[in-house]
């Protein structure tokens, strides 16, 4: 698993267990990045990003509408593949995350 995935999953406040929407989106994009050109099915994203099936569907719809991932419908499932725009967004988000952590802020 991508080492940056663990950075996104770290909790700055151990008593607070919830991720922001941006944290969830970053987790989904990280899974999509790890899967590369072959893409990821919903169950794989759900398992690796620790989200329900329906939460993954909702977020992937938003990411597809924004052009950050593309959806390919197979015989039995959807495959989600990160786009070039999604890769650029994810890289910029990683830089932002590092900056935020360096000044001890929680996004």
Q: What residue ranges belong to the model's regions?
A:
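Basic, amphipathic "hinge/linker" alpha-helix immediately C-terminal to the N-terminal HTH DNA-binding motif
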Residues: 75-91
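A short, conserved structural fragment
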Residues: 64-74
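Basic amphipathic alpha-helical segments that dock to polyanions
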Residues: 45, 56-66
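Short, surface-exposed loop/turn segments at secondary-structure junctions
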Residues: 39-42, 72-76
